[in-house]
């Protein structure tokens, strides 16, 4: 084949639409934003929805459970004080699970609402369903 056979091919790349870079950045920022936040017990200040006017569920979601366990296991691995009696456990995740089962984890879950307000829930206020 000669080079003349390929002269009529257009490989300039004009077939693709230009993508607005700002739109992609906005989408990525929205995806990275979580609807929950883990807060230390002393860090929950005012400004949220009062306990009597909460609208979210009193059940801990599997995502909140995973985040609480991961956060607490990391704290335990970094030599944080343990809130339960140990029966020979050395794995931080197992210790965190034991603390969660006894509702002794000193963490507050902050749930953000669509109107940018939030609700603070302590671990002992939430109902956990064993899966």
From Swiss-Prot:
It is found in: Nucleus. One of its GO terms (cellular component) is RNA polymerase III complex. This is DNA-directed RNA polymerases I, II, and III subunit RPABC2. Belongs to the archaeal Rpo6/eukaryotic RPB6 RNA polymerase subunit family. Keywords: DNA-directed RNA polymerase, Nucleus, Transcription. Its main location: nucleus. One of its GO terms (molecular function) is DNA-directed RNA polymerase activity. Disulfide bonds: none annotated. Component of the RNA polymerase I (Pol I), RNA polymerase II (Pol II) and RNA polymerase III (Pol III) complexes consisting of at least 13, 12 and 17 subunits, respectively. GO terms for biological process: transcription by RNA polymerase I; transcription by RNA polymerase II; tRNA transcription by RNA polymerase III. DNA-dependent RNA polymerases catalyze the transcription of DNA into RNA using the four ribonucleoside triphosphates as substrates. Common component of RNA polymerases I, II and III which synthesize ribosomal RNA precursors, mRNA precursors and many functional non-coding RNAs, and small RNAs, such as 5S rRNA and tRNAs, respectively. Pol II is the central component of the basal RNA polymerase II transcription machinery. Pols are composed of mobile elements that move relative to each other. It comes from Drosophila melanogaster (Fruit fly). Residues 1-24 are annotated as: Disordered.
């Amino acid at each position: 084949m000669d080079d003349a056979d390929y002269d009529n091919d257009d490989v300039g790349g004009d077939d693709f639409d230009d993508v607005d870079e700002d739109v992609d950045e906005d989408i990525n920022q929205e995806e990275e934003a979580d609807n929950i936040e883990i807060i230390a017990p002393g860090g929950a200040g005012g400004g949220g929805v009062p306990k009597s006017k909460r609208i979210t569920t009193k059940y801990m979601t599997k995502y909140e459970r995973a985040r609480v366990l991961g956060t607490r296991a990391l704290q335990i691995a970094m030599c944080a004080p343990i809130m339960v009696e140990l029966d020979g456990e050395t794995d931080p995740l197992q210790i965190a699970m034991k603390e969660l089962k006894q509702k002794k984890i000193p963490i507050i879950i902050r749930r953000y609402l669509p109107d940018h307000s939030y609700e603070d829930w302590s671990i002992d206020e939430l109902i956990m369903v064993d899966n």
